[in-house]
Amino acid sequence: MPTIQRIEQAMNFKPLATVPCNNDLLAENYIDDGRQLWLIDYEYSGNNDPTFELGNTCQEMQFSNSQISEVCAAYFGDALPGMIARMKLNMIMSDVGWGLWAAIQAKISTIDFDFWGWAIERWGRAQEKMDSAEFSKWMKDVAS
């Protein structure tokens, strides 16, 4: 996976301080009781790059580019190209990571779910982004 290594190297060029993260913020892990918003499911929580948390969430929610910019601005105070690029690259890493997780689950889980199909879907989505015209721009923006 040389492209994954390139992403890691680009992200490590200017690393961000890690912050407490849930690392699994998909829609099902939010509960809104009308008075308060609850975040649940902390089995993967720990300190991480905040752009992974944001990128993973944007990927899971299938946010548009404008929504991704809004999330970036809400967290960092501005939709900075370098931070958006980090989020976009972490959206790829989210799909790669969850795709690998699903491939493992396909072999070991007793749950009646098509984990293998889900793994293929996630990998395909990651590959599509790595093959996109925007990928090289994100890699450059991360370093700037």
Features from the language model and the residues they span:
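Alpha-helical transmembrane segments of integral membrane proteins
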Residues: 86-92
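ATP/Mg2+ or Mg2+-diphosphate-binding catalytic cores
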Residues: 101-144
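Active-site activation/catalytic loop segments of kinase-like enzymes and analogous catalytic loops
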Residues: 50-81, 92-110, 125
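Conserved protein kinase catalytic/activation segment
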Residues: 29-39
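An alpha-helical support segment within catalytic cores of ATP-dependent transferases
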Residues: 1-23, 33, 140-143
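Pre-DFG segment of protein kinase catalytic domains
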Residues: 20, 38-41
